[in-house]
């Protein structure tokens, strides 16, 4: 396989595009170009070509992993799944995640703490926080520690109810407010106590609460 042309400037993703004599193209990062000492006219035997394809895939997975982690807090499992969904080779995705861990760029314990902190700041209940940890694929071994100091949400629930309801609110409006709080992960018991504190009649909600 022969290098027919090599772009001298990278694209927006930082890749240098190489065109080969068989018409195929590869977007390579600078390190890969330098590691293989590529230049226009260079001949690669089959072993070298295969090594280049492997190296290109590994570097692609690593760089994509860096971009994902830079944009959002992710767990090890979540990162690996995202890489595969984006088209990276499963084995190379696994290796990229291991590389990220070695670089201390992925930490499930720290991610769990960040997820829980975000839920608290948004006024979400404990169940919503657990759902968020599950969706982020955080291993359960980190859940208890991250959730240990989850604050009581009664004040936030009360403030929410006050913003939605008043003395003239009917049962339909109350139910709508309750449903909104349930979606935010608050328990029926805590919501009922807040309603009682605000002097709303919860007798009709007994079976649901």
Spans of model-derived segments:
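An alpha-helical, amphipathic repeat domain used for nucleic-acid recognition
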Residues: 1-209
């Amino acid at each position: 396989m022969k290098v027919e042309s090599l772009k001298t400037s990278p694209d927006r993703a930082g890749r240098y595009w190489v065109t080969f004599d068989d018409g195929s193209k590869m977007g390579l990062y600078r390190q890969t170009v330098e590691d293989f000492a590529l230049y226009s006219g260079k001949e690669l035997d089959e072993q070298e070509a295969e090594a280049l394809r492997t190296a290109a895939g590994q570097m692609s997975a690593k760089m994509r992993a860096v971009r994902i982690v830079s944009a959002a807090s992710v767990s090890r499992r979540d990162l690996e799944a995202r890489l595969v969904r984006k088209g990276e080779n499963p084995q190379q995705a696994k290796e990229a995640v291991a590389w990220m861990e070695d670089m201390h760029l992925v930490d499930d314990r720290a991610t769990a703490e960040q997820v829980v902190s975000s839920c608290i700041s948004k006024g979400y209940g404990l169940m919503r926080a657990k759902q968020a940890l599950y969706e982020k694929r955080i291993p359960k071994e980190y859940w208890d520690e991250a959730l240990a100091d989850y604050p009581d949400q009664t004040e936030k629930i009360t403030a929410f109810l006050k913003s939605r309801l008043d003395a003239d609110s009917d049962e339909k409006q109350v139910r709508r407010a309750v449903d909104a709080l349930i979606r935010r992960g608050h328990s029926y018991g805590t919501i009922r106590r807040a309603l009682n504190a605000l002097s709303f009649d919860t007798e009709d909600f007994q079976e649901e609460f």
